[in-house]
Design a protein with these regions (language model features):
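Short C-terminal tail/terminal secondary-structure segment
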Residues: 1-2, 98-101, 152, 231, ...
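Conserved glycine-rich cofactor-binding loop
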Residues: 10, 17-19
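Active-site helix of classical SDR
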Residues: 127, 163, 171
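Active-site loop-to-helix junction immediately N-terminal to the catalytic Tyr of the SDR YXXXK motif
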Residues: 107, 153-161, 173
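Residue(s) in the substrate-gating loop at a strand-loop-helix junction
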Residues: 147
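Alpha-helical segment proximal to the catalytic Tyr-Lys
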Residues: 132, 176-180, 239
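Substrate-binding pocket helix/loop in short-chain dehydrogenase/reductase
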Residues: 102-104, 108-116, 211
Length: 256
């Protein structure tokens, strides 16, 4: 058994038309998996799938656009994946949203509801759609991309952090429930990564210096540096790991 071999495995990655999700999809395909690219907009999904097929061979990737806020669209994502590839071995819940920045007292019910819906409830929906076949097969890896925000307080993105902490607890609970059936559930908690999602932080040189100086590695992360963690959690290399949160943050959470 090769530790990081994903040959014959099928992976669904949400939010995979760009950023961390795209990097994860590319690296899973590189290690042998067939991958499903999914985000809201069809065009970018098609582009990523086409690039993966051009690099690794036709049929290695398909695009199935879906809005994570829609239970019906998530079910279609699962159904079309099974129709194309016959099964789902790996699920990466990466898509998330944050429509509000500011103190908790200022967030509207609609904004808070959207954050919890898209970042927690939608993950729950999709996981429950995919899990029955994994439990029956007694094999599967589910990965939730959380954030170090789920480990810390923050005066500007408190609601987002609440949702990311909930993702970690979701993984822990499901790991306990499904461990006897050899279905593993883990989280990745990235620090600041150079994606469009965090563009407001790294576009400003002064702000970037402010947020990276406390980190031992003194720099921002790249999407591909999160992808390595996903390959590990998806592969046989992590077969004895479940219910955990793998922190990939340049050391910021351990620095004084």
């Amino acid at each position: 058994m090769e530790l990081f071999d994903l040959s014959g495995r099928v992976a669904v990655i949400t939010g995979s038309s760009r950023g961390i999700g795209k990097a994860i999809a590319e690296r899973l395909a590189e290690h042998g998996a067939r991958v499903v690219i999914s985000s809201r907009k069809p065009g970018p999904c098609d582009e990523v799938a086409s690039a993966i097929n051009a690099k690794h061979g036709e049929g290695r990737a398909i695009a199935v656009p879906a809005n994570i806020a829609s239970k019906e669209e998530l079910q279609r994502l699962v159904d079309e994946t099974r129709a194309a590839f016959g099964k789902i071995d790996i699920l990466v819940c990466n898509a998330a949203t944050n429509p509000y920045a500011g103190p908790m007292a200022g967030i509207t019910d609609e904004q808070f509801g959207k954050i919890l819906q898209n970042n927690v409830v939608s993950n729950h929906w999709l996981i429950q759609m995919v899990s029955p076949e994994m439990l029956e097969r007694k094999d599967g890896s589910i990965i939730i991309v959380s954030s170090i925000g789920g480990l810390r307080g923050n005066a500007l993105i408190g609601a987002y952090n609440v949702s990311k902490a909930a993702d970690m607890q979701l993984a822990r609970n499901l790991a306990v429930e499904w461990g006897p059936s050899n279905v593993r559930v883990n989280c990745i908690a990235p620090g600041l990564v150079q994606t469009d999602f965090a563009k407001y932080l790294w576009e400003n040189p002064e702000l970037l210096k402010q947020v990276t100086d406390p980190a031992p590695l003194k720099r921002i992360g790249q999407p591909d540096e999160i992808a390595g963690a996903a390959v590990y959690l998806a592969s046989p290399a992590s077969s004895y790991m479940t219910g955990q949160t793998l922190v990939v943050d340049g050391g910021i959470t351990i620095a004084w």
